[in-house]
Amino acid sequence: MITICVSGGLKKDRKLAEEAIWYVMDMMMPRKRNLDISLTLKKTLEDGAQGFCYGGDNDNEYIIEIDKRLSRLFGMNELIECIMHEMVHVWQGATGRMKDKFRGGYKQLWMCKDGKYRNYTNTDYEKQPWEVEAYRMQGPITKQFMKDMNYE
């Protein structure tokens, strides 16, 4: 069963976030049947990012935190784009493209084209393959969502 829980922030932002999550689920993971996504709108800018995505206690649980002030400070488009970026990370984790390992120290692993996982823990943020992919995908997904949901 797919469970989506959105909390914090303004009611209109919670509604928009839930719509965006379901949109990405339908578009990128239509066959996924067991996923638990919890999105909290809270202050994250002070922590150095508009949003964060973490794996939960099991492989089907994801926690997203997004700054609750994005829509007011930068506009609705920025909030949607941030949600889409973090949902790309959910997709990466749910499909096995990215893994976090904790045994023997924390490691962030990425499945390369040859099918092997490689450790990118010490790679600069802007060069981490999951971030490169998420930044590349967030714009087109946001644009399509805005068009399909008549937010343009």
Outline where the language-model segments fall.
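Acidic/histidine-rich, surface-exposed loop or edge segments in extracytoplasmic proteins
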Residues: 1-7
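Catalytic zinc-binding patch centered on the HExxH motif and its immediate surroundings
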Residues: 10-13, 40-63, 74-76
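Zn2+-dependent metallopeptidase catalytic core
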Residues: 12-35
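Short alpha-helical scaffold segments that flank and stabilize functional sites
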Residues: 20-23, 91, 137, 141
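Short catalytic/ligand-binding loop motif for oxyanion handling, primarily in non-cytosolic enzymes
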Residues: 47-49, 73-74, 91-92, 99-101
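Short pre-active-site segment immediately N-terminal to the catalytic Zn-binding motif
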Residues: 64-83
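Metalloprotease/metallohydrolase-associated module, dominated by Zn2+-dependent proteases
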Residues: 77, 97-152
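Active-site recognition of the HExxH zinc-binding catalytic motif
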Residues: 81-94, 134
